[in-house]
Every structure is written in C-alpha cells, then in structure tokens.
C-alpha cells in the first residue's frame, strides 16, 4: 500500500455546483416522467416502506438525511464528466467530502482513492465496496439542465450514480462509526478507468486496494430494471471482453485495375464477414463467443484502392475457458482468411477483462441486504450479459459479488447504457447507498 496521501478536512474543494432550475424535458406521452432538476427527488419511501427493524430503520434515516446532497453531487458529476485516467476533479470532490466527514481518504497514483471506515478486530478482514468513476467519449443528449458541460464526454454508463451511491453509503457508515455503532471494518474503493482495457481495477490492486480485504461488493446501474429492485446472479454475470486490432497493407492502385493491387478493402470485408463465422467453428458455440467490429478505416477516394486499412472491435466470451483460448484462435482465423489476398497483416488481441463470477456466499449476502432495506420482493434474477466489467479482476483475488441496480422509472421508458440519452430515476442513489451499506454490515458480522 502506498504512503497515505490523506486529504485534510481543510483542503480546498471545488464543491458541488448549484443545479440551475429548468422546466426539464418534455415527457414521452403516456409514460411516467423522470423529475427535472427543478423538482425535488421523491424519497425512496415513495416506493418501499421503512422496515420495522430498528437497526435497518436507522440506516434508512442516515441515508435519507443526505438524499438531496447525494443527488446534487451526482448531478454535479454528471455535468463534469471525466474520461478514464483523467478523473482528477471527481477524485477531489469525493476526497474532500470524505475528509469533511472526518475520514482519511488515500489517493491512488493518478486518480481514484480508497477510504477505510472502522477498525479491524480479531483479525477479521475488511469488506470492500467499489464504485467506478469514469465517463465515456459520447455526446450527452439526455436533455437535462445538468447535462455534460464537456463536449463529447458523458456519464452514459451510470458511474456518476455509482459514485454518489457509494459516497452516501460510506457517510452513513461513518455516522455509525462516530456513534460507536459500527462493528465492522469497511473499505470504500472509488476506482478510475473502468471503461478502458484492461481496467483500472488492476491499478487499484497494485496500490494495495484489496490488502486485508475478505470480500468485495459493487452495484452497476441497469436501466432495464425498475428503481427499487436489484438484479442478482450466482456465477458469471458478465462476459470476458478483449479488444482486437487488425491492420492490412499492400500495393494500392486504380479501382479499374484491382488485379494489380492487394485490394485491402476487399480483404477487410472478408475479415469483417468471415472471421466471426470461423470463430463459431473453432470455439465451442456454448461459450457464447461474440466478435463485433466497432470501426473500419480505409481509403478516401472512390476510384483509388488504398494501401492500408484497419479494423477494431471487441471479442467477448461468456466462458472463461474459451476466453483463455480466444486470442490465439482469433489471430489464426484472421491470418487464414486474408492469406489468399497477398496483404501484409498485423493482428493483435489486447487482453481485457475476465467475466465477473459472483461467489455464491457473497451473492446470498447481497440478496439478504437488498431484502432487508428494499423489501422482500426487491431481488430479481438477472441474466449473464455480454458486457465486460473490470470488477472481474477483483474476484480473481477476493470473493465477492456485483448486482444490477434498477434505475428505470416504474412503467417508464427503457433507456440503455453507453447511449447519450441515458436518464435515471435518482431514487436509485438512495437505494444503492442502502444496499451497499447493509451488505457491508452483514458481511462484516459473519
């Protein structure tokens, strides 16, 4: 673990920007509307009743007391998104708020931070709670008054919600610690760079983020699930994901004489269409292998065959064993497909992330935490997705579980992540804070 770079309570802070008033975005006819920034966010109790258990009711009260603050903080982060490994402002905002609560955040090299709450007793390990903080290089089209102020960058995957929810959970746990009511040791992990391969989690582990940790938990926004509900799954919940790069070179020339060229455009077309089919014959189809191209670049003139072209994409597998073999199989398939065309080839498979494989015991704890704070019907079974998540690297070191936090207005429009129009029901922040705090309490008492 690096030497502490704690932020003092008196450190200068940019604070949270005030949210301008606005009439908001016109609702879709016939669908419930997400409240605009000019309107207060309804309390979570508009969806779920506060439990009778005194301890859980107290946790509800502590989280609810900061509802407006955490919503404002989330909107501030949404308005000021930062790409992977540049989350300097986000790190300062979170660190300053933790320091103001009397805590001692420790900055990671570059960006991101961790913060311990409570003391380890009897040699018991800490429980880690993780949120990612980075945004995406996508224009923000959500239409909210707190939309991104950074051109071409948006919180289109809900990491602003993750950050606010974890901060709310951490402050509630700090309240319990200050009152002498916290009997578990917790570590908050505010992680940078989830959206780039192989992910910021590797740097967090290298900096000692999992040292002394026995279990780790996280939530990820799911706009297909109603707010107040959480999707859980034992075993793999995401896929493995690698980035692939193909570059072809050869003699270019006039389009009237392709036989005098290597025609890299035609060869690229063969790679695009044929390699996915080849993979389906060389890898077990039950592994759910999926090759999807994201970019193709070649040429600039209609009557000239270019001398070079490139492809990039993602290679995903549901099964970790297939993932371990996929890079070699992919590279061989590309070479076999382009061999007849006489082009020079460079092919690279950049290792990304393994599947997130949820530990059974940890997932049962998450289920219990969700039911405790959100009600007996709040847990829903979720499917394994083809999305990648670098939380999977943590689970190669430490048992844990990730769940999907519902963000959809009940009965409302279903948005999707990695799209600039993503909008969330901000009651999810309060729900996420409660679930994270409660699972830490349950896990620490085992």
Specify the residue positions occupied by each region the protein language model found.
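Active-site beta-loop-alpha junctions enriched in small/polar residues
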Residues: 82, 132-134, 193-195, 222, ...
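Histidine/acidic-residue-rich, glycine-tolerant segments that coordinate divalent metal ions
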Residues: 112-114, 136-138, 143-154, 160-161, ...
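Intrinsically disordered, low-complexity proline-rich tandem-repeat tracts
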Residues: 2-45, 54
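Metal-dependent amide/peptide-bond hydrolase catalytic core
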Residues: 40, 44-47, 51, 100, ...
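Divalent metal-coordination and catalytic microenvironments
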Residues: 77, 129, 159, 188, ...
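Acidic/His- and Gly-rich active-site-bordering loop/insert found
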Residues: 41-155, 160, 164-184
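Non-cysteine beta-strand/loop elements that form the S-adenosyl-L-methionine
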Residues: 128-130, 139, 244, 402-408
